[in-house]
């Protein structure tokens, strides 16, 4: 198994786990005219990375990684799973994390089974754990010999790739502009990854109030292309 | 200055009474209006101080015992004065079997340079009901003081049956976040959150789906089923009083809904106990007439209400009594 190639494959936006069906609130922002052009799309993308992903999904990935490194018991993973579930208040966002986790775990098990991943999938299917994508990703990447730094860099990159792709479809912005945002935020991603491990415990799961409201409003949006 | 507030609400017959409460200066907890007005307990927390000062530490403990019903009110906006060290508030809430606790305080107004940390730990029995709100203003907006405070960290953890079900981690640090930007307050100055944690949460969500169908001009809101037994409403607006009134009306709606549901269940239990169980009824065999049996059965019944609630979500129109429908409509109209 080639770690880099595995990382490129599981992190590909075309990896068929259904991530392209989620906008994580962006669809509400666009329909309400808040994200409406390239500059506002860039602000949205930058704020998402710095204020939402950094304290949430990327932090969950890092926390799961730390548990894996320390060979912590199943109980500790259960606590982390509960914590993430309790933090993800908007129902669509919570469900998105679960759906992606299940499809990611099923698919990767067919490629190269990793025991911890099959256990996690079984627990989710039994209803004992909720299941979250960031944790599933951490488990598989860790078991594939990928480093935490690379896993985080790739995770941020693909999240941002999803954001700009959705912006290109929804706002819409030009494909070139979308790629420019992706490229221009490289330094931000690098900085966030470097600081990830030193995050204070109480900063994990910080809420962005506007983002949460827009995600909740998406449940009631009249016409929509995305599940979240 | 270190202050403590302790409230114990206990049920005696149809009444909820205040027992073993204590407080020290500058705080005071007294009955809100006449104590004979309601069967439930209404208390108001008052303070002789103009607000929270630098170095203040406040410990609040609220215990709502079995089947007790408590509404705790605040007197005025919670003003956070300019600080150097900062102030801390710790709140511990315990709501036992079948209890209801409602607390929707006035907005927190952080003045320039204030530093505040508030941690709320709420333990609920699986059959307990919580109606919990919080509103945060960006400052003394009308004096042109918006997002001038240093740091405000509000952590709320809700446990149901020892399991963490809700964790709201709100850090507002104007140096750290772009508050007027996307993901944050956009053009607004206030944020509001209401949590309803209850075995009846899924049923209430179905009601809200019917009631909250349009947005208001003055503020924007969203609501969601944030856990199998919890509903969350969040809003952003420009008027603290308006958000407070709206959140209070929504909280009152949750209260009426809970009380109504509990009474409905109690009536069913009473009917079952007085009539002989028929063979075709699928209910569990009724045991000997022991008084203790009643509480055990009630708990069981309330636990199964959860699964009933889940199923009920699929039904478009809820079988709610006309009386309650009217009350709900009134509560919304009051807005």
Where are the predicted features?
Chain B
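Conserved beta-strand/loop scaffold segments within soluble protein domains that form the structured core
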Residues: 1-206
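A structural signal for the main folded, soluble domain(s) of proteins
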Residues: 138, 151, 319, 326-335
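Intrinsically disordered, polybasic Lys/Arg-rich low-complexity tracts
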Residues: 274-319
């Amino acid at each position: 198994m080639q770690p880099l190639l595995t990382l490129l494959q599981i992190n590909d936006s075309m990896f068929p786990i259904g991530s392209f069906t989620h906008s994580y609130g962006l669809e509400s922002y666009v329909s309400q005219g808040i994200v409406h052009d390239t500059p506002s799309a860039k602000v949205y993308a930058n704020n998402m990375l710095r204020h939402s992903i950094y304290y949430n999904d990327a932090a969950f990935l890092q926390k799961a990684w730390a548990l894996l490194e320390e060979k912590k018991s199943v109980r500790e993973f259960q606590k982390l799973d509960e914590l993430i579930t309790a933090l993800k208040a908007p129902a669509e966002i919570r469900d998105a994390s679960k759906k992606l986790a299940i499809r990611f775990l099923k698919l990767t098990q067919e490629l190269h089974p990793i025991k911890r991943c099959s256990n996690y999938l079984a627990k989710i299917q039994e209803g004992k754990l909720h299941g979250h994508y960031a944790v599933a990703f951490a488990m598989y990447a860790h078991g594939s010999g990928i480093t935490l730094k690379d896993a985080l860099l790739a995770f941020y990159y693909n999240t941002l790739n999803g954001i700009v792709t959705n912006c290109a479809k929804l706002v819409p912005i030009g494909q070139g502009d979308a790629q420019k945002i992706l490229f221009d935020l490289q330094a931000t991603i690098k900085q966030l990854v470097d600081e990830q491990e030193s995050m204070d415990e109480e900063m994990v799961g910080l809420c962005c109030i506007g983002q949460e409201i827009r995600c909740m409003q998406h449940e009631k949006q009249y016409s929509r292309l995305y599940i979240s | 200055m270190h202050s403590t507030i302790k409230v114990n609400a206990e049920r005696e017959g149809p009444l909820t009474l205040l027992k073993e409460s204590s407080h020290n200066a500058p705080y005071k907890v007294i009955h809100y209006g006449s104590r004979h007005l309601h069967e439930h307990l209404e208390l108001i927390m008052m303070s002789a101080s103009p607000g929270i000062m630098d170095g203040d530490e406040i410990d609040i403990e609220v215990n709502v015992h079995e089947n007790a019903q408590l509404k705790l009110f605040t007197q005025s906006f919670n003003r956070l004065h300019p600080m150097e060290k900062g102030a801390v508030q710790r709140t511990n809430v315990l709501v036992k079997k079948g209890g209801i606790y409602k607390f929707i305080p006035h907005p927190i107004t952080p003045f320039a340079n204030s530093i505040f940390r508030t941690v709320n730990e709420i333990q609920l029995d699986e059959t307990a009901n919580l109606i919990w709100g919080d509103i945060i203003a960006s400052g003394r907006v009308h004096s042109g003081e918006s997002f001038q405070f240093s740091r405000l960290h509000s952590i709320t953890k809700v446990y149901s049956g020892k399991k963490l079900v809700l964790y709201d981690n709100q850090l507002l640090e104007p140096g750290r976040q772009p508050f007027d930007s996307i993901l944050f307050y956009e053009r607004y100055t206030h944020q509001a959150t209401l949590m309803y944690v209850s075995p009846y949460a899924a049923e209430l969500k179905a009601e809200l789906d019917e009631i909250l169908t349009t947005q208001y001009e003055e503020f924007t809101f969203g609501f969601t089923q944030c856990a199998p037994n919890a509903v969350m409403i969040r809003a952003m607006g420009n008027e603290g009083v308006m958000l407070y009134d709206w959140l209070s009306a929504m909280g009152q709606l949750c209260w009426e809904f809970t009380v109504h549901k509990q009474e409905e269940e109690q009536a069913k239990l009473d009917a079952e106990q007085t009539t002989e169980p028929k063979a075709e009824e699928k209910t569990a065999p009724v045991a000997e007439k022991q008084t203790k049996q009643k509480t055990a059965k009630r708990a069981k019944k309330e636990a199964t209400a959860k699964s009933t609630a889940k199923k009920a979500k699929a039904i478009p129109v809820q079988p709610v009594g006309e009386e309650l429908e009217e009350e709900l409509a009134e509560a919304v109209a009051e807005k």
